[in-house]
């Protein structure tokens, strides 16, 4: 009778050992998934850094460097703007003058000066970038939700849930910003 007890104990120990090995395999797979997510996130951040927001001053400086323009041509722009503001009231009231004024504000004075981006184009560029960021955040949220399924460690689980909440809130903020720009 003791022989049967030994066999059942050995069988239970064998099953317990196999379960522990399987758990270790699952933990390893989860760690590998988290590492893959980290590396892909770092790669995305590197590619998204090319879309870093720039100020108008930076854009103008880049345009000047690209075209090798001296800064004296930039000094003409405030003078031209001042001349437009000094136009007589009779011309300002004329309905034909208003479209010409708005066109002249966005037109180039010479081939050497950087042009301003019209509001429509700028808004389109901003919306395009925000939609790209939003789609990448949604993909990250999906990957985080998949990673939650395999995690057994409570600290990692809490961290992933926290990051998903941040991700969802950021997506909502970007979508509301897009709606306000439209």
Swiss-Prot record:
Broad class of where this protein is predominantly found: virion
Q: What is the effect of changing residue 130 to A?
A: 90% loss of nuclear export
Q: Where is this motif: Nuclear export signal?
A: 96-105, 122-132
Task: Give UniProt keywords alphabetically.
Answer: Host nucleus, Host-virus interaction, Transport, Virion
What top-level branch of life does the organism fall under?
Viruses
What this protein is reported to do is described as: Mediates the nuclear export of encapsidated genomic RNAs (ribonucleoproteins, RNPs). Acts as an adapter between viral RNPs complexes and the nuclear export machinery of the cell. Possesses no intrinsic RNA-binding activity, but includes a C-terminal M1-binding domain. This domain is believed to allow recognition of RNPs bound to the protein M1.
Annotated protein name in UniProt: Nuclear export protein
